[in-house]
């Protein structure tokens, strides 16, 4: 009687390198996917990527007109400074009038400010240091004397 032994072969794949394929925007090799696609990544929301609105903000200054792009969650003064504009400001908290401007067209959210009264806001005055764009907007700058 002949007996045969069956042997089983064990193959280990632990030595093989696993290549990952990009599965999220963060894993793409671009330096700044936010500016590339107009997206914002937030780790506070579990790493989700959300679309952010970007608006054109035109500043009418004593030196002329200049236009910058501003995301909906960025103060217009900050966007102006990032673009190299030199606009007046002092407190950066919406509690003085150094950065005052006047909205010519468009709309802004300045709910963070505590200086302007309802009448001044209804006339279009804005504190650029605490104003978010909610549409494309045109703002005349250097209006501190007009509200005093």
UniProtKB/Swiss-Prot annotation:
User: What organism does this protein naturally occur in?
Assistant: Arabidopsis thaliana (Mouse-ear cress)
Location of the 2Fe-2S ferredoxin-type domain: 55-145
One of the GO BP terms on file: electron transport chain
- Its job: Ferredoxins are iron-sulfur proteins that transfer electrons in a wide variety of metabolic reactions.
Concerning PANTHER family, the annotation shows:
FERREDOXIN, FERREDOXIN-1, CHLOROPLASTIC
Q: Which GO terms describe its molecular function?
A: 2 iron, 2 sulfur cluster binding; electron transfer activity; metal ion binding
Indicate where this protein resides in the cell: Plastid, Chloroplast
Answer yes or no on keyword Metal-binding. Answer: yes
Q: How many cofactors are bound and how?
A: Binds 1 [2Fe-2S] cluster.
Question: Protein name, please?
Answer: Ferredoxin-1, chloroplastic
Q: Which residues form a coiled coil?
A: none
